[in-house]
Amino acid sequence: MDMTTKSCREFVTVLASNEPAPGGGGASALVAALGTALGNMVGALTVGKKKYADVEEEIKALMKKCDDLQAQLLDQVPADAEGFVPLAKAYGIPKDDPSRPEILEKATITACQVPMHIMELCCESLDCIATFAAKGSRLAVSDAGCGATIVKAALQAASLNVFINTKTLQNRAVAEEMNAKCLGMLDKYGKLADEIFDTVKAGFFK
């Protein structure tokens, strides 16, 4: 079931239940889509204004990219649920079954893929929001700051859905490769999100 077709209230109700999905990954994707949309809104409030005519084409291009990012992020909500299914089934295999370790290992790697992709999309979103914050309408700059803060939270949340799985991998080389990629994104784009927030906030105290 694609929870993105449900109401906000329905999504939250199911999220709070004992259903296996949506979980942290799906919630991260939805939150990232919301943060991206806030940045995109800044673009929508910039286009068509004479004051920003010199950056209009750049803003339009960013809006188109964000439209795509929003759609991709929403697609990750059901994708994350689907990615968890093999892992749930693997845990159900009797511990004395000789096939269990290999099946569990493969399922664990599969379960990492969607949250890692969510992180990658969050990074792309933050790059866009940085430009919206710097060049978009000053009347909506707070929304760019909000978007950056929200997408950062989604980035961090998605990373935990990777780390909980890499911790259990027997192939430590694969685990460390995934961890390094995620930690790199957290470091670089966590700092970018903080810079956006700090710059936007500072502008209100000048």
Give the role of each language-model region.
Residues M3-A21:
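Short, hydrophobic/aliphatic alpha-helical segments
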Residues S17-N40, A140-A158:
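Conserved phosphate/anionic-ligand binding catalytic regions in large, soluble enzymes, centered on
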Residues M41-A53:
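Transmembrane signal-anchor/signal-peptide helices with a preference for the extracytoplasmic
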Residues K50-K89:
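A structural-propensity feature for long, helix-poor, extended segments
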Residues I59, C66-L73, P115, C122, ...:
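Amphipathic alpha-helical coiled-coil segments
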Residues A79-Y91, A193-K206:
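Long, charge-rich low-complexity segments
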Residues D80-T149, A153, N165:
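Amphipathic alpha-helical interface segments
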Residues I118, S125, A140-T199, K206:
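Preference for long, well-ordered alpha-helical segments
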